[in-house]
Structures are given as C-alpha cells and as structure tokens.
C-alpha cells in the first residue's frame, strides 16, 4: 500500500468512530408524547379521567356568585352589577351570554368522555399481570379503570343534562370524533330520547359506582362521581 493512502484511511476511520460516538453521547431527546404512549400508560389514563371533570361548571363563580335561580322569578341577586341581571333586563344575546359557552363546553366534555371510553381499554398492565408479587396491584388498577369508565359515562350524562335543559333535544353522540368526521351526518334527537339516554347512563353508573360511605380511598377520590350523584341526576 502506498504511504500516502495510510493517513487517508486512518482519517476516514476516525471520522466514522467520532460520528458514532457523537450519536451516543448526544442522543436526540424525545419530547413528543405519542397517542400510543398516552393510551397504554396507567398514570396518563388516571390524569385523563381527572380531566373529564374540568368541563363541569365552576360552581357559583361563573355568574358572579349568583345561583341560576336568579335568572328567573325564583330568586333575586342583590349585587346590582352582577352579570346574572343580563337575563332579567334582556340585555343578553348570542355574543353576550352570562351563562357562557354552555354548548361548546358541554360538547367538549362529551367528546372527551367518548374518547376516554374508547381508549381506556388500551392501558398496558402486563408488567403487573405477570408478576406474582403484584397481583393485588394489578387487580386494584383493573378495578380503578373499570370505575373510571362509569364515572365517564355519568359525566357524559351530566353534560347532556346541561345541554337539554337549555336547548331541548340535541344530537346524541357516543363515539369519538376526529378532525375529518362528517358532522352533517348527525341530526338532532328528540328531547324524550335525550332524557332516556341520560337516565339509562345514570342507572348504569349507579350500579357500579360506590356510595361515599363505602369508598376505600377517600382522599384520592374526593370530588369524583359516586352512586349518589348518579342516582340524584
């Protein structure tokens, strides 16, 4: 081999080695949470079940502390500057509604519940299932996921209740929708059909959800839907 070829070959070898080392020492950080990872993770599913409650109305705060009864003849709210009086004086309209965006908020909650019900079956618990020392943890997590599904069904029923008491019959949608879903295929269901759906979902939830006095982990389940909530609705 000619002498001048040796430095060239050595240089090429060093380039390959240093390039490979650079990949090992400076790996690309994976910052994207994929849909698949989110669906199989128990902790992410827990977080998503909690997120379903974020569409509930904010108690008495979204109407300046007034109850909805003050929008009718049932009650009178004494704070004269409160937004609730917009109903009484007739100053509210589609762009200025003291009740907020009830249509958007409740349908977002319904769509989130539909997606949760579909994807909560994909949680990967095999690492517990096949570990003889983790059988109790495995069963507890299965039970939790099962309960969260019925919480989601109750919340979906509640969001439909919030819609029908304002708008009457609305489309009953129980499957997840994507960006390419054709919304024109959905029509308005009758009020009686909506009420039957709400009652059926609440009956199913009440048969599974626990009463507050029978909860075993009250601290971590405070504020979640219960048997009493489903029966009350």
Regions found by a protein language model. Give the residues of each.
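Proline-centered turn/helix-capping motifs that create local helix->coil transitions or kinks
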Residues: 23, 61, 163-172
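Short, conserved phosphate-binding/catalytic loop or strand-edge motifs used
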Residues: 173-181
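Membrane-proximal, proline-rich intrinsically disordered regions
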Residues: 21-69
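Bacterial Sec-dependent N-terminal signal peptides
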Residues: 1-30
